[in-house]
């Protein structure tokens, strides 16, 4: 049976998130501060409070299997013996704006964790508590709701029912993709000297990584200029992915010119096999992708300043569907054109689209830089293939990424 794996947050936010992009409430500093506050509140809750509890459940709907998993911020039993799911949220919103219904996604996350917990512990009822921490005043505001296990189970099933068309779309795509990759041929009449050996080593590394599961395997390659390293890496990685030895390929580079080399290699594969089913996206820097900059030339990621940020999540699904129904490679031009048509941010659109793509091309920092790395992929385990171009540049880049900056 085909199966879709989803995190609780991914499921909830994709279906229920509304509103706008607002840089005042996002970013690395906010995320780090939120994590510190989470740990502080969890520690202060006492011995009976279990923090970061991993929960997973399996569901079947219309012939599709779903694996839903995530970590509940906290689970404890109150004085009345009721199990409580605690969902902690940090916010910069004014205290009087922190209402019980401020964000439906927050309740939804807690309710999905509650559904899984109730199923695992065979509970008839439980409570879901939202704990809001106001970061400017250190004030804590809590709201609690009581649910039956049947209510929570019905809620989770309703979310999955809403997600079904998207799940079916992705499963159908992966089946077509793997079938076309199985038939994919090397796009040149012959290999260059040393190219076949290099491609073979890349393929074996991808296959070994799948076999070893945790940690995968690593391959370091050094080859002379002109051997065709880009195709020697991409072609075998694609063949391995088509055989189920990886769900997504990340081609990471230090320079725009090497990103273009990856795009050119994929274009050659598509030209050699017009039936090839392959989604690739190139992630540009926010400064280059932005369609609305402030007076100083910086991205104006505020709903009151940018029409592409304002109401972004209301229009995102239509923009995604538009792109996923097309066959063009999702480069900067394609993202910009779609973003203008749907009035969404092209940078964020590229990030959201990357979850549906087979190949993601971008800068090293999307994997290695703790301030901008793609948390949607790398904060949890995934069956990924990483192709790191010009890896000799990594030490200098890593030193810059992990060095303190003083303003």
Predicted regions and their residues:
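Mg2+/Mn2+-dependent nuclease catalytic core
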Residues: 57-153, 233
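Signature of the SF2 helicase/ATPase Hel1-core->accessory helical subdomain module
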Residues: 233, 342-359, 364-407
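The conserved Walker
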Residues: 225
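Walker A/P-loop NTP-binding motif
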Residues: 230-245, 265-269
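Metal-dependent nuclease catalytic cores that hydrolyze phosphodiester bonds in DNA/RNA
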Residues: 1-78, 82, 104, 108
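Phosphate-binding Walker
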Residues: 228-235, 256, 260
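A substrate-engagement module of RecA-like helicase motors
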Residues: 178, 185, 214, 245-360, ...
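Conserved pre-motif I regulatory segment
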Residues: 173-222
């Amino acid at each position: 049976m085909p199966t879709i794996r989803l995190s609780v947050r991914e499921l909830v936010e994709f279906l229920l998130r509304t509103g706008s992009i607002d840089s005042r409430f996002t970013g690395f500093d906010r995320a780090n501060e939120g994590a510190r506050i989470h740990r502080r509140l969890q520690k202060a809750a006492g011995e009976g409070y279990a923090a970061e509890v991993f929960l997973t459940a399996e569901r079947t709907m219309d012939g599709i299997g779903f694996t839903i998993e995530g970590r509940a911020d906290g689970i404890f039993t109150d004085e009345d013996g009721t199990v409580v799911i605690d969902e902690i949220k940090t916010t910069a919103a004014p205290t009087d704006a922190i209402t019980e219904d401020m964000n439906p996604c927050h309740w939804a996350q807690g309710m999905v964790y509650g559904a899984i917990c109730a199923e695992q512990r065979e509970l008839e009822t439980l409570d879901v508590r939202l704990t809001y921490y106001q970061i400017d005043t250190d004030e804590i505001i809590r709201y609690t709701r009581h649910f039956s296990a049947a209510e929570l189970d019905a809620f989770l099933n309703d979310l999955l029912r809403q997600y079904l068309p998207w799940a079916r779309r992705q499963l159908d795509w992966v089946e077509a993709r793997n079938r076309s990759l199985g038939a994919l041929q090397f796009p040149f009449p012959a290999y260059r000297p040393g190219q076949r050996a290099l491609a073979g080593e890349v393929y074996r590394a991808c296959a070994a990584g799948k076999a070893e599961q945790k940690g995968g395997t690593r391959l370091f390659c050094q080859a002379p200029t002109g051997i065709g390293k880009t195709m020697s890496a991409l072609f075998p990685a694609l063949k391995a992915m088509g055989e189920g030895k990886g769900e997504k390929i990340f081609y990471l580079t230090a320079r725009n010119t090497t990103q273009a080399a990856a795009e050119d290699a994929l274009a050659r594969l598509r030209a050699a096999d017009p039936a090839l089913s392959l989604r690739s996206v190139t992630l540009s820097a926010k400064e280059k992708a932005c369609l609305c900059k402030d007076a100083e030339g910086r991205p104006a990621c505020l709903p009151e300043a940018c029409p592409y940020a304002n109401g972004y999540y209301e229009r995102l699904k239509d923009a995604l569907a538009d792109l996923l129904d097309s066959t063009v490679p999702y480069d900067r031009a394609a993202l910009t054109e779609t973003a203008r048509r749907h009035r969404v941010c092209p940078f964020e659109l590229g990030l959201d689209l990357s979850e549906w793509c087979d190949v993601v091309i971008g800068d090293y920092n999307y994997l290695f830089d703790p301030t901008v790395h793609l948390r949607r992929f790398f904060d949890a385990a995934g069956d990924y293939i990483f192709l790191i171009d010009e890896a000799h540049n990594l030490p200098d880049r890593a030193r810059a990424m992990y060095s303190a900056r003083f303003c």
